[in-house]
Amino acid sequence: MKEKYQKIDGYTEFFSFFFGENNKEEISKKLWAFAKKSMYMIDEEKDEAWKSLNSRIDDRLNKSEKYIQDKKITKVYVRTFGDKGNSETKSLLERFYKYIFSNKEVISLDSSNNSAPSSTLNKYTKYTKNKDHKSKNILFNYQVSHVFGKTLNCYAFTAPWNVVYLPKVLDPFTGHESKGELTEQFTEKLQEFVKSNYREQIREFNQTMEDLAPKVKQFKKEIKKEGNIKEDTLKQFFKSLDESFSKIDL
């Protein structure tokens, strides 16, 4: 008789052992209830935060260097592609943005890959992870997560609809480092919640992605034609670009 094998989810095992709960639907409901109660996003100032991000991109694209300096237009950041110490992957992303933005210095790479999103949340919410802050609620054992990923996209990396303070215990369920039903259900609920609360901003993002799509496609075509970059590196880079510059289903 052939032995039957089971699918074993480490998260379900954890909840069963510590809380006596092994029903995935119930676990999923409780996870989301806890998340809604304990997570913090840019809410009251979401319009200002979104307007500021888009204005800075537009100014860096269209205004003179003197105007940018005089008006103190702050930098616009994206996450590094691949290994931070890899000059080839760094150069790829920089070349992409110079192509997209007609050789204008619009973006900078976030040296820590999370400093800019943290600063954005710190600026536009009443919460911070800075333990020495004197005028905000200080969060411990929280981290910054991206609801939709898209961390190579300057319109998304620090967008108010994409950054959230989550308790570290919940971070695995956002889907970046784990798989399975619980992760899928939690990620879906988080994204649907954000879509319902930031719908107009996401619509604007989608329109921008539609406008940029021809340039993204042409860049990929031209850089592939050069033939001087490793095939595996290009394949991964194109995959990351597709994920970061795709529209969000509403």
Where are these regions (language model features)?
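A broadly used, surface-exposed interaction patch
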Residues: 105-135
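Polybasic, low-complexity binding patches
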Residues: 156-158, 173-216
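Short, surface-exposed linear patches
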Residues: 164-168, 187-190
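Generic detector of well-ordered alpha-helical segments enriched in charged/polar residues
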Residues: 12, 16, 28-32, 118-125, ...
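Histidine-centered nuclease catalytic patch
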Residues: 123-165, 171-178
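Generic surface-pattern signal
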Residues: 20, 36, 40, 58, ...
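Mixed-charge, low-complexity interaction segments
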Residues: 1-112, 181-187
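C-terminal, well-folded lobe of enzymatic/effector domains
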Residues: 209-250
